[in-house]
Amino acid sequence: MIEFMDKNKIMGLSQSEVKDRQKQGQVNDFQASASTSTWQIVKRNVFTLFNALNFAIALALAFVQAWSNLVFFAVICFNAFSGIVTELRAKHMVDKLNLLNKEKIFTIRDGQEIALDPEELVLDDVIRLSAGDQIPSDAIVLEGFAEVNEAMLTGESDLVQKEVEDLMLSGSFLASGSVLAQVHHVGADNYAAKLMLEAKTVKPINSRIMKSLDQLAGFTGKIIIPFGIALLLEALVLKGLPLKSSVVNSSTALLGMLPKGIALLTITSLLTAVIKLGLKKVLVQEMYSVETLARVDMLCLDKTGTITQGKMQVETVLPLTQAYDKDAIAKILTSYMAHSEDKNPTAQAIRKRFAGEVAYPMISSLPFSSDRKWGAMELEGLGTVFLGAPEMLLDAEVPEAREALERGSRVLVLALSQEKLNHHKPQKPSDIQALALLEILDPIREGAADTLDYLRSQEVGLKIISGDNPVTVSSIAQKAGFADYQSYVDCSKINDEELIAMAEETAIFGRVSPHQKKLIIQTLKKAGHTTAMTGDGVNDILALREADCSIVMAEGDPATRQIANLVLLNSDFNDVPEILFEGRRVVNNIAHIAPIFLIKTIYSFLLAVICIASALLGRTEWILIFPFIPIQITMIDQFVEGFPPFVLTFERNIKPVEQNFLRKSMLRALPSALMVVFSVLFVKIFGTSQGWTDIEISTLLYYLLASIGFMSVVRACLPFSLWRVLLLIWSVVGFLGTALFPRIQKLLEISTLTGQTLPVYGAMMLVFIVMFILTSRYQVKR
């Protein structure tokens, strides 16, 4: 047990005491990082199921010395390297932005207050914490009073009061008040060390695209080994092919089943979006939050700092009793704000207006709470002064307050009571007397109206959730061009059941407690919405944590920045549309080009099934060997799955995201995959009956496979633009340039289309083009 420090002699540790503790390892070095480590990045890009299966296939090809067919593995290595480089670049940018945003802990050492990083704290350090700060280590209160939000640790939204000698847990946040505290545990000894890691880092986000691809990979991963064995035995034993040919043909089928291209492109696109947003001063703390943004159809806004500038100013002070004129009111407010530890924007505005000589010494105080909507202070020679929302402190409505609210102002009442201040059970006294009204203005953010209109035009639903009076919020919303400004509710007057019932239809929620903010988000999510929440205060933390995606302003409380998915470093609400649409660009473009990649997965699976089935028929001449070799697939991929889709992912595409990504992509790819299967069966049967050589059959199939792939690229390039046409020309010319080059033909085991195969190619492609147009039109109608 640490000996409790004498609070009357708070000098902090000396430098020699600090060094002693550092030598003993009593340092708070257990820190959660919002950034992935370099090793995690390497591991994520190298040690994957895709790479493991590809590596196994490469080993088999190397064993039979099929060196030319190992080109695919060079592409796999390059893809892994590219993924590592891109992630490292994104990590560097995130780390750099996080460094600029890093919060310091005010620490007392040798009687001087200094700012330290959380990991520099040692056991017994004395730290100063204020509202909005996250507690970096378990600490005992030496001086002061605070209300602590322990929701990150316990899941309970109720605030916990902390007084002298109380223990505060790391990972929790100060919702109100200010304290001096002594570090009680450091590093891994902290009670909440693991929970702190979870609270400080961003909540994991499920990527629907990656989840779909994982399902596909899981399926192929289960069948690839038995399929591989069956195909190898078929070629080697039943067909009597040499070991090398058997391994090469079997490997091609297995490689084709792996949807590695689309997985790589998804990660690359998301990381590119992280970098692009970083250049726009938007800190993305979780890569997959970009995808979640794309699916957002309900954006919940905290009024202060988003629609408004968050720059409060006291407009008027209106005395409500003849016993206290403006001068008397000013003395009370000056004393109140001089003693108050409240640092929210409203308190700062009042403090700026009423600064001067203190007339009343403080006996005790109760910080402002976003749950109560008021704070209080017992002043010597005066009584207990209350400052907060009129409807929370007064029984009767004040007409002047209503008028100010309708002007869009924030209204506070200054009230007085002769009852003692009760910290343990804060409640409104029975003898409370209203002294004055304070009208506080918060200017509307420039461009907010255009931003709201634009979001609405893009099918993004909007809700305003605020702790302010709903009449004030409605008035501000009207000035900001919010269409549903008349749809509002006072949440202080309804219970949870009523709030749940109104959450979907109501547009503006006023006098919302932190618990109610969270409940609104939960209700919207249960209704099927993908939610995003913007905020900047400690009272927003529960809702931000609950939302599918959280967006906060850099000027907001440190606590919100630490748990947010995205941080607007410019603190500009007008950046929100661009962030949403960057996510849409990535997801829509991936969904748009996914069929190009899935064609190979489908036809490889179908052909493998047909090959295995043909072996069961019992006649050697009917046995079908997988018709392609890895080098052929790799070469076609460079011009079909490689450059064109990569370029297309950068195009702007802000339409709402479609659901059922994998199902729709598979259906769009199916006609082309069936064309490939038909081509193989027809050319094998017809070519054999015509006495074609294996090279002629292989050449025709190579051109048909590439051409069917190019049709999908053409569909992805519709409607045509100059840039897209040039992209198509480059791909086709590149393909022909390699296919007609003699040395490459030798590697590919093909030749040139002959007088026999060229007419068949032309006729089949004519039929395929007609079928492709018809199926594409049918899919568009659906």
Describe each region flagged by the PLM.
Residues I2, K102-K211, I494-A507:
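Cytosolic catalytic regions of P-type ion-transporting ATPases
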Residues A52-A74, K222-P259, L271-T272, K276-K281, ...:
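Helix-interface capping motifs at the ends of transmembrane segments in multi-pass membrane proteins
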Residues S68-K102, R109, N206-L301, L455-Q458, ...:
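Hydrophobic alpha-helical transmembrane segments
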Residues L231, D342, D484-A532, A547, ...:
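Membrane-embedded transport module
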